[in-house]
């Protein structure tokens, strides 16, 4: 498969503070990566850096072999990076359908297809963003990211704070996206075993540095190492 994303020696942060140091990773088309670590180690920072929202101090970022470190966020999105932020970023003045159509790019993902995987959004298509439950907002955030028809989907804590029945619904959708959509996926998820079960490879961050990388299946079979790497102490 062709190289999609390459990050080499990335050092980045906010203002004068450094949140990531010397981070490297690579993804091919259709690949999947779990990004694990304790709270505050730089997982979300890595995703927002990929979206152009932090200050890159060193290292290289390549998208399909092209350096994209200087690209603004909208160009990254237009080039095929979909982002589901932890905060969801709903607009109270836009309806469900307007959230979807506002970012739409040509491709297999359409409003109708989003409604197929999330029928609840079809029922709420005329509702405003602030009229949705937390689970519905997360469905909309994922649907909106899919509407850019991404080659890479970034998921930041997609299950956080949701009822178990909603988690199961989202898990089914995300599993199908990882295994059957052809797009690459990076998942930040506090439930480490869940993230490992969904992905092919894993990196673990500690204090902004990569301290472990392996096949997800191998770490899933090694609970002692997993606990040592991600358990809260």
Locations of the language-model features?
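The feature captures the beta-strand-to-loop junction immediately N-terminal to the Walker
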Residues: 36-38
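Conserved ABC transporter NBD signature motif
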Residues: 59-68, 79, 109, 113-116, ...
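ABC ATPase NBD coupling module
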Residues: 55, 67-88, 111, 123-127, ...
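Catalytic Walker B motif of ABC-type/P-loop ATPase nucleotide-binding domains
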Residues: 153-157
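ABC ATPase C-loop
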Residues: 145-146
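C-terminal boundary and immediately downstream tail of ABC-type ATPase nucleotide-binding domains
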Residues: 198, 204-209, 213, 220-233
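Helical segment within the ABC ATPase nucleotide-binding domain
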Residues: 168-181
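Helix-to-loop junction immediately C-terminal to a conserved catalytic motif
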Residues: 51
């Amino acid at each position: 498969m062709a190289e999609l994303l390459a990050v080499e020696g990335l050092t980045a942060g906010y203002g004068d503070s450094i949140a990531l140091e010397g981070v490297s990773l690579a993804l091919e088309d259709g690949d999947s990566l779990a990004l694990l670590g304790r709270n505050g180690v730089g997982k979300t920072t890595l995703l927002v850096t990929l979206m152009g929202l932090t200050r890159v101090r060193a290292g290289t970022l390549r998208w399909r072999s092209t350096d994209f470190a200087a690209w603004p966020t909208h160009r990254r999105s237009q080039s095929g990076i979909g982002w589901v932020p932890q905060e969801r970023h709903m607009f109270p003045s836009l309806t469900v359908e307007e959230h979807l159509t506002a970012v739409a790019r040509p491709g297999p993902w359409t409003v109708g297809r989003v409604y197929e995987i999330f029928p609840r959004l079809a029922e709420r298509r005329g509702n405003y963003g602030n009229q949705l439950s937390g689970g519905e907002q997360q469905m909309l955030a994922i649907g909106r990211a899919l509407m850019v028809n991404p080659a890479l989907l970034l998921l930041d804590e997609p299950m956080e704070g949701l009822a178990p029945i909603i988690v199961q619904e989202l898990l089914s959708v995300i599993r199908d996206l990882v295994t059957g959509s052809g797009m690459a996926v990076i998942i930040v998820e506090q439930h480490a075993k869940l993230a490992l079960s969904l992905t092919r490879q894993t990196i673990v961050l500690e204090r902004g540095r990569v301290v472990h990388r392996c096949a997800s299946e191998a770490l899933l079979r090694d609970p002692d190492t997993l606990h040592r790497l991600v358990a809260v102490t």
